[in-house]
Swiss-Prot record:
Originating gene: HIS2
Keyword Hydrolase: yes
Catalytic activity field: L-histidinol phosphate + H2O = L-histidinol + phosphate
PANTHER family: HISTIDINOL PHOSPHATASE-RELATED, HISTIDINOL-PHOSPHATASE
Other observations noted: Present with 4280 molecules/cell in log phase SD medium.
SUPFAM superfamilies membership: PHP domain-like
Coiled-coil residue spans: none
Name of the protein: Histidinol-phosphatase
UniProt record similarity statement: Belongs to the PHP hydrolase family. HisK subfamily.
A Pfam family the protein falls into: PHP
Amino acid sequence: MHSHHSHSGDYSAHGTDPLDSVVDQVVNLNFHTYCLTEHIPRIEAKFIYPEEQSLGKNPEEVITKLETSFKNFMSHAQEIKTRYADRPDVRTKFIIGMEIESCDMAHIEYAKRLMKENNDILKFCVGSVHHVNGIPIDFDQQQWYNSLHSFNDNLKHFLLSYFQSQYEMLINIKPLVVGHFDLYKLFLPNDMLVNQKSGNCNEETGVPVASLDVISEWPEIYDAVVRNLQFIDSYGGAIEINTSALRKRLEEPYPSKTLCNLVKKHCGSRFVLSDDAHGVAQVGVCYDKVKKYIVDVLQLEYICYLEESQSPENLLTVKRLPISQFVNDPFWANI
C-alpha cells in the first residue's frame, strides 16, 4: 500500500503528532511505500496563516522560522529513510519530497530553487493549489467565501482562475504528483445557488450547486481541465486520489468521479494513492472507503506508485500495481 502525500505536527502548524510517531504508525500498518512531503515555506508575509503568527514577533521572523523548519524536515526525513532502508523486518520504503505552495510566481520559482538545491534529498514534489486570487481556499469557510467574493461571487470565474493557477504551476514545475486536483470543493456549499449560464451565485434564477457537475456545466472549465490533464500526461505525471476529502466528510475523495474519468481519458489513468495525513490517526485514513471507490466506482485496472531506483541518481519511476494485487495487499489486514 502507498501514500504519496503526508505531513506531521513537527513541521506543519496544522499537524498534530511528531513525524516519528507518524512513521511508527506507517510501519505498523505495513505500508509498501510512504512519501514524506511537508509544505515548502511561504516566503511572503501576506501568505502567513493565522496559526503561524505566533512563531515570531514579526512576519520576517516567522518566515525565517518556516525556512529553518523545512531544512530540519529534510534532515529528519533523510535520517528516517536511512534508518529503515536496511531493515529486513520492515517492508516500507520511504521517499522524500515536498508539497509546493503555488500562491504566486514567486513561490513557484522558490519551489524550483528548493528542488534544484536539494535534489540529493528531495526526489519529487506534490504540485498543489491552495490559493485562488491570492486567498486560501482550504483554511476555513470564510476565506473560501472571500476568494469567491474577489470574483464578484461568480463561481465560473473562480474555477477558471483555480485551473489557470494550476496550469501555471504545472508548466513551471512539472510535478510528478498533482495534489488534491479539485481542492476547491472542500468548502463549496451544496445549497449555494448558481446561475447555470453566467456562473453568478445566489441569484433567484440559480439552482443549487449540488445539482450541477461544475466541470461539465461550462465548456471553459471543461477545456481548462482537459488542457491541464493533457499537459500532465505529456511529461508522465500522476494524479493523486486523496482520501482527506473523505476524512472531511465529502462524498467523494479528490478527485471526483467526473474528473477521474477525464484522467482515464486524457492522462493515461495514472493515479497514485495518498492519505494526506497530518497526524497518527490520519495515516491510511478512509483507505477502506477509497478501495471501494477505486475498484467499484472507477473500476481501475491498476493503481500507480512511485519507486526509487538504486542508481547513484536515485531517480523515481511510476510503477503499476494490478488491481488484483492491490486488493490483496497485506496492508488491508491491519486496518
